[in-house]
Amino acid sequence: MIIIFRLFLIFFSINAYSLEIIRDPFFENYFKNIQLKYNLPVANVYIVDHNEINAFVLGNNVYFTKGIIKNIKQEDVLKSIYFHEVGHIYHNHYNSKKLEINSSKKNKVYNNILSIGAAIFTGNANIGIATNLSIDQSILNNLSTNSIRHEIEADNFMLENISKNKINTSDLIDFFDNLPESNNRFYKSHPTNKNRVISLKKYTNFKKNKNSINFEWLKAKYGRNSNIFEFNNFFSSLNKGIVNITDAKSIDDINYANYEIYKAGIMIDDIKQMYLNLIEVNSNPYLKIEFYNMIIDNNISEYFEIIERNKHNSEIQSEYFFYFLYGKYYNKINNKDLSNFYFCQFYKVADLKDKSDYYCNKYDINSIPKIDNSYAILK
């Protein structure tokens, strides 16, 4: 079988140590809705702050760069690329590659690829919740070299979903034909564009779909090149500290526009209600982490019970800042043992020995409830 193209888990050759992950609840929920619509395997999807045209998979996580979002003009192209990425997850390629690397380089640890941005650890333990993590570049380089078999399997998964969902591939063909020369290195071990185009042409007769409003919103946010020019104006103005809320009136939920305004550091009316409205339509756990952090910072004690209850939510627990949030929460309500316990876990995860040693020696293990202790990194 002809290998159509080598999409992703691709090798980054960027001269940087790490790549910043932007946490965007709207972006992440957009892909969650795609998963539900097309009955795809569950995956977390994040955006990376880099202009390289790229996407890759680590574990059950899919990463898209800002550059690829900017350069994709049609939503069906993004969906097709996403199908390919999910194909890697469906076939468990990441774990296969990780095992291969670990067996050949036993002196290195490849499990912990996420490292916290050093800047957020300045100051005291009352720092806010940061919105980014970073991906260790050297580890990514080793993990993202695919075998031909992996690419065939991911291509097949993509084509099955293109065919099943009748997605037109004309714009996908154009996307690959127009890739900058700097990206050609990703395809050196694969057939020419001509062969890829031949394989995709059988799907060019399907009816083209119109871009969704939410796709256009993401295009405006990360590329300033949405077909809805008012969205571009909204984000361009916001970047200058100017709020033109009328430019965002076409968005499905105006609370998302208010969220962007708030995240830009501009005060809005009733922040609490904005978060409550968003959480009704968007179950993203990071959005909840942000909301709980705002509750703690503003001492809105009527919602402390919600924070307490959601400590047992597995999605909240999967968030990198879970331990930090609950260390901060218990510090707010003057439960010093639980606060130090959770900060201890957080700094262990972050691999900051001085801070972890400090907090891990400041609580009485006998005062920690069994349910909390069951969440510990340190048993």
Whereabouts are the PLM-identified features?
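Extracytoplasmic and endomembrane cell-envelope/extracellular-matrix remodeling and assembly machinery
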Residues: 21, 29, 44-45, 142, ...
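Short pre-active-site segment immediately N-terminal to the catalytic Zn-binding motif
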Residues: 63-80, 144-146
